Each structure stands twice: as C-alpha cells, then as structure tokens.
Curated annotation (Swiss-Prot):
This is Chaperonin GroEL. The gene is groEL. It catalyses: ATP + H2O + a folded polypeptide = ADP + phosphate + an unfolded polypeptide. The lineage of its organism: Bacteria, Pseudomonadati, Pseudomonadota, Gammaproteobacteria, Pseudomonadales. HAMAP family: CH60. ATP binds at residues 30-33, 51, 87-91, 415, 479-481, 495.
Length: 547
C-alpha cells in the first residue's frame, strides 16, 4: 500500500478551496445570455467548444491531489444537478462555490461547522418550498419555446423546434437528437409505432423507388418463436389468401424453407406478404410483441399461453391501416387496437417506469410508452462545421431536458431572479443557536451568486443590479441580454422550477459537506527516476569493405 499524506484543519480546507475555485471559475464563465465559450482540448481531433457547465467540469483534473479533491467534489454538484434535471449545472456550480467560500470564512472565524451546515440545510428546505410555490404550470407552446430558448443560450430556433416537436408527439412522446447533414435544424415526426427491424428479404420490396415494402390494410401475425417449417404456417396463410389481404409476419426469426416459400408466394402474387424480426431481446422482446398485439388488436402466438402456429386463425391476427417496412425500420400506422386496452397498457408501463431503478430500463420503457401513447420525433441538428455541430447538439439536448423539467414541475422567473424572490421564505427563519443563524445568513448571500454572475458576464455591476432586483417584487428582474429591467416572464425569460430546485439542493448538500471537512488524505506522488539511456553500441568495425 502506497504511503499517504494527511492534511488537517485550515491547511486542508485552503487546498480544497483552491480546487473549488479553479473549477467553478472555469464553469461560471459560461453562465447567462452573455456567457463565454470554453475550449476543451482533446487528445485526438479538433478541440471541443462548449457553453455546457457539466462538460467543462468533467474535463478538469488538477495535479495537486488535495486541490483536485475540491474540484472533484464540485464536479459532483454539477453531475447531480444534471442527473436530476438535465440542466442547471452551471447554476449549481456557482451556488456551491458561493456556499463553500462563505462557509469557510465562517469556519476560519471560529464558528462550529456542524451548526453552520444545519443552518444551511434548514434554509435550503425553506427556499425549495418557496420555489415550488412560485412555480407556474408550463402548458402552452409559447412557454415551452421560451424555456428551450433560454436553456439553449438564447437560440430561438432551438426553442422553437423543441416546442414544435413536443406539440406533435405530446408529453409522453420520445424526442431524440441526431446530427443532421444540412445547415438548418430539421424536425421529422414518425407517426404510428416504429421499431428498428427491417424486412428479412429484399424480395418483399414492392416500392423500388424508395426500396420499401408497403402493405395497405394488412393483417399482422405475431409469433414468439423462430419459424423455419412452412407446414406450421399453411392454415393461416390459406385463410389470409382467402381473405385477400396482405400479411405482415413479426417473429423471432423466419428462416430457411419458410422464408423461401413466403418470398415465392409474394413474387407470384398469391399472398402479398412481408416478414420482419421482432424488436428487442429476451423479456423485452416478449413485452414489445405484446405492445404491438395491443396496438393492433391481435394476439401473440406463444406456446407459453397454449397457442400454436398450426392452430392460429384470422381472429388471432392484428389489423392496421398501413405498414411501411424499409431496410432498417418497420412502421405500423393506425393499429386497430381497443383504446381502453391501449390505455391500460400505458398505465402499466408508467407504473414500471416509477418502480425501476435502472436508467437504461427507464429509457427503454419510456420509448415503449411513446410508441403506444405519443409518437417519436427526431431533431436533426444542422451546422457548418463538425465542431459547431457537436456544440449545438449539446445545447439542444440541454434545452430538451429543460423543457421536460418545465412541463413536469412548472416554471419560475429566470435570470437568477427566482432564487432572490425565494429569499422571503427565510426572512424570519431562526436556527437553534447563533451559529445556525450564521448558516442561514450565509445561504441568503450565496443564493444571490447566480444573478451576480449573470450580470458580471454581461459586463454590468452586480451589486447595483442585485440591489435594484431586491427592491422590486414578483417577476421583476434584469434581462442581461438587453440590459433592461422588467417582468421576466413577459420578456420570456423562464427557468424550469425543477432545474433551479435541483441546482440549489445539490449545491447545499455538497457545499455543506465540504465546510465540515477537518482532514484530507491523499496518496504521496513519488517522482520516479528517469529511465537510463540505451547502452553504447560500440564501433561497427569490419564493415569497411561493404562500400
């Protein structure tokens, strides 16, 4: 085990504070409408340019182990805020820096760190409750666009496209962000249920110009196993041929003789048919087949429930208005399922989303929910260069998280004003002793930090602006983009309540822990001696005759 270095008291806290300030100073330069960019060096390829707080924080690693601990703890604040609300990372970092700086001053003056922390915690609970009261529901497209615009660093086109996407696919819908190929942002919406499985044979294609197989008013056969024997399928194929309707087969796989027979029947025009693999794997595949069955009013042919392929009839088949299959995707449009069954399935999936602890499972369940209840929208980000594209894509993703948070918990006035207004919650708040009162007062000052930083980044005098905003009431605040005072909500400067709340909670939690630090332990870095040079090879005698 390597030897460790231990620092105590003030010397430990001073080192930690250096790390906190280095990281926070780099991150806070990006805050507000006039925040600057940060350039991040990459070991390969072009540098990344970003205004995203958490991206900057993740890149910072300091040489001194003790300073680095401070930096890593603040990085954790940004990550926590990002995980909770998907945005507000810079605000959280600025708040944490203010809490730690104010707190360590009080500790140096001889205050008890544990009581300071209790005071901070008390004040945080009161401010969070006040923020929830200040929040107004965010339902209309205009408010959603404004939230998206602010989060995307005042880029109106991004706010607009996100609001449009949300309007089209609803609150339950899935919105994904991809890199586009043009200069402009594009929005495409997939109607119906789409899953990432294409046709099993190109011979099913009946639209050569788009290389797609389109089936109008098809029947759907859903099978939870591999089909390789055509004999099992003959009864259902004959029934479909008599009905004179196209057939889509969704199975674990269709191979060998069964696939060849389907292709021949399709080419001869006996039965218009197409086959695709079922989406997902394992238990998720079963669940998705069941989703398709409920959406189309069919039944999954599975031996688990005592149904065999030979015994399948037209009653077991699902119905849809149209199915489009290309090389990669299958889209089922207007399934004929019973609305009450679909709603019951949606409720069941929502319950699973609440109960799951895995982020991956939650994401997959959300996708299933969107396919049943809403739809899927894809925002393709356009830019002139790859560097700009990456920076813009990160902003679109941030804005998307912010708008989702706004729909969830409502909006508050932006520009750091909500936190200043929430201070009224701790006007008469008293702790159990004088030191807790100092903790409450300390948070009162720290909460002004985001507004001060936004103003400083815009080149104005923070103290003057904070004083004027405090004299106002309600939504009155300072628009740093234009330098005008007024009603923040009317000016379209909104923040999601969830983002502001998560930022404060993350900052107070980790800031409080840092104040109460008394000792720090780190490994001693040993300077390894340089490697010795190569030994002398001596003369290459005896080679003279080779000329």
């Amino acid at each position: 085990m390597a030897a460790k270095e231990v620092k105590f008291g003030d010397s430990a806290r001073k080192k930690m504070l250096v790390g906190v300030n280095v990281l926070a100073d780099a991150v806070k330069a990006t805050l507000g409408p006039k925040g600057r960019n940060v350039v991040l060096d990459k070991s390969f390829g072009a540098p990344t340019i970003t205004k995203d707080g958490v991206s900057v924080a993740k890149e910072i690693e300091l040489k001194d182990k003790f300073e680095n601990m401070g930096a890593q703890l603040v990085k954790d604040v940004a990550s926590k805020a990002n995980d909770a609300a998907g945005d507000g990372t810079t605000t959280a970092t600025v708040l944490a820096q203010a809490i730690v700086n104010e707190g360590l001053k009080a500790v140096a003056a001889g205050m008890n760190p544990m009581d300071l922390k209790r005071g901070i915690d008390k004040a945080t609970v009161a401010i969070v409750a006040q923020l929830k009261e200040l929040a107004k529901p965010c339902a209309d497209t205009k408010a959603i666009a404004q939230v998206g615009t602010i989060s995307a660093n005042s880029d109106e086109s991004i706010g607009q496209i996100i609001a449009e996407a949300m309007e089209k696919v609803g609150k339950e819908g899935v919105i994904t962000v991809e890199e586009g190929s043009g200069l402009e942002n594009e929005l495409s919406v997939v109607e119906g249920m789409q899953f990432d499985r294409g046709y099993l044979s190109p011979y099913f294609v009946n639209k050569p110009d788009t290389m797609a197989a389109e089936l109008d008013s098809p029947l759907l056969l859903l099978v939870d196993k591999k089909i390789s024997n055509i004999r099992e399928m003959l009864p259902v194929l004959e029934a479909v041929a008599k009905a004179g309707r196209p057939l889509l087969i969704v199975a674990e796989d269709v191979e060998g003789e069964a696939l060849a027979t389907l292709v021949v029947n399709n080419m001869r025009g006996i039965v218009k048919v197409a086959a695709v693999k079922a989406p997902g794997f394992g238990d998720r595949r079963k669940a998705m087949l069941q989703d398709i069955a409920i959406l189309t009013g069919g039944t999954v042919i599975s031996e688990e429930v005592g149904l065999s392929l030979e015994g399948a009839t037209l009653e077991h088949l699902g119905n849809a208005k149209r199915v489009v299959i290309n090389k990669e995707n299958t889209t089922i449009i207007d399934g004929a399922g019973v609305q009450a069954d679909i709603e019951a399935r949606v409720l069941q999936i929502r319950k699973q989303i609440e109960e799951t602890t895995s982020d991956y499972d939650r994401e997959k369940l959300q996708e299933r929910l969107a396919k049943l209840a809403g739809g899927v929208a894809v925002i393709k980000v356009g830019a002139a260069t790859e560097v700009e594209m990456k920076e813009k894509k990160a902003r679109v993703e941030d804005a998307l998280h912010a708008t989702r948070a706004a729909v969830e918990e409502g909006v508050v006035p932006g520009g750091g004003v909500a936190l200043v207004r929430a201070l009224q919650a701790i006007e008469g708040l008293k702790g159990d002793n004088e030191e807790q009162n100092v903790g409450i007062a300390l948070l009162r000052r720290a909460v002004e930090a985001p507004l001060r930083q936004i103003v400083a980044n815009a080149g104005d005098e923070p103290s003057v602006v904070v004083d004027k905003v405090k004299q106002g009431s309600g939504n009155y605040g300072f628009n740093a983009a234009t330098g005008v005072y007024g009603d923040m909500i009317e000016m379209g400067i909104l923040d999601p309540a969830k983002v502001t709340r998560s930022a404060l909670q993350a900052a107070a939690s980790i800031g409080g822990l840092m104040i109460t630090t008394e000792a720090m332990v780190a490994e001693i870095v040993e300077d390894k001696p340089a490697m010795g040079g190569m030994p002398d090879m001596g003369g290459m005698g005896g080679m003279g005759g080779m000329m």
